[in-house]
């Protein structure tokens, strides 16, 4: 069965393994999430469940949001994500999914929004080498030529140029679940995940995990 949770990144710390190795981990408050919708192949063309995370005051939600969550009977939520799975029979509306759904040693993919760093040049954004620093080059951090002249008379798509750095959807794959604290709904993941503290992330079974 496919597993997944919406969570909140709390920050990074370190723990020690039994053999004395120091492991850098990210602490994620994973769930509890509530199943608010089920999708089927017959009706929607694919099989999935939609889960909600983070309670929201119903007075601050519009009628569409309240009506959407009415079937689950668990109030309104701040964040919603879809989790595709082969079979949704194990879930029904209103079911609560908690951190205990994952076990130590599981491999997961984590999707979040990277930290926005504003407008950046090509050296910081793309790792360009830059030009000479001396001898009158007058070409230090500039991008250089961005294309030809008469032919093709345009700049090609996806040309690496200055612009917004960060603040985009990023997925980190094959992170190991180092520890699960079911009582407090905490999951410790080996390594770093996208985003800043208190950022919302989606944790799912790794698509590249060995079967």
Curated annotation (Swiss-Prot):
GO MF, one example: structural constituent of ribosome
UniProt keyword annotations, A-Z: Ribonucleoprotein, Ribosomal protein, RNA-binding, rRNA-binding
Keyword rRNA-binding (UniProt): yes
Listed GO CC annotations: cytosolic large ribosomal subunit
Coiled-coil ranges (or none): none
InterPro entries assigned: Ribosomal_uL3 (IPR000597), Ribosomal_uL3_bac/org-type (IPR019927), Ribosomal_uL3_CS (IPR019926), Transl_B-barrel_sf (IPR009000)
GO biological processes: translation
Gene3D superfamilies: 3.30.160.810, Translation factors
Signal peptide annotation: none
Keyword Cell cycle annotated: no
Role description: One of the primary rRNA binding proteins, it binds directly near the 3'-end of the 23S rRNA, where it nucleates assembly of the 50S subunit.
Family as reported in the entry's similarity comment: Belongs to the universal ribosomal protein uL3 family.
Subunit structure: Part of the 50S ribosomal subunit. Forms a cluster with proteins L14 and L19.
Protein name: Large ribosomal subunit protein uL3
Species this protein is from: Citrifermentans bemidjiense (strain ATCC BAA-1014 / DSM 16622 / JCM 12645 / Bem) (Geobacter bemidjiensis)
Gene name as annotated: rplC
């Amino acid at each position: 069965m496919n597993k997944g949770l919406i969570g909140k990144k709390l920050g990074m710390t370190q723990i020690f393994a039994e053999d004395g190795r120091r492991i850098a981990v990210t602490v994620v408050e994973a769930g509890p999430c509530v199943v608010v919708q089920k999708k089927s192949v017959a009706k929607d063309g694919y099989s999935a469940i939609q889960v909600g995370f983070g309670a929201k005051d119903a007075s601050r939600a519009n009628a569409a949001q309240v009506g959407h969550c009415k079937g689950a009977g668990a109030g309104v939520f701040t964040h919603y994500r879809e989790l595709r799975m082969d079979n949704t029979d194990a879930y029904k509306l209103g079911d609560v999914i908690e951190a205990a759904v994952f076990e130590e040693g599981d491999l997961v993919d984590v999707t979040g929004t990277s930290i926005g760093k504003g407008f950046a040049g090509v050296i910081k954004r793309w790792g360009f080498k830059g030009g000479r620093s001396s001898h009158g080059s007058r070409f230090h951090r500039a991008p250089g030529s961005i294309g030809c002249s008469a032919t093709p008379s345009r700049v090609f798509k996806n040309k690496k140029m200055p612009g917004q750095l960060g603040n985009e959807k990023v997925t980190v794959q094959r992170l190991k679940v180092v520890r699960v604290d079911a009582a407090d709904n905490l999951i410790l993941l080996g390594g770093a995940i996208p985003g800043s503290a208190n950022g919302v992330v989606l944790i799912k079974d790794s698509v590249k995990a060995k079967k």
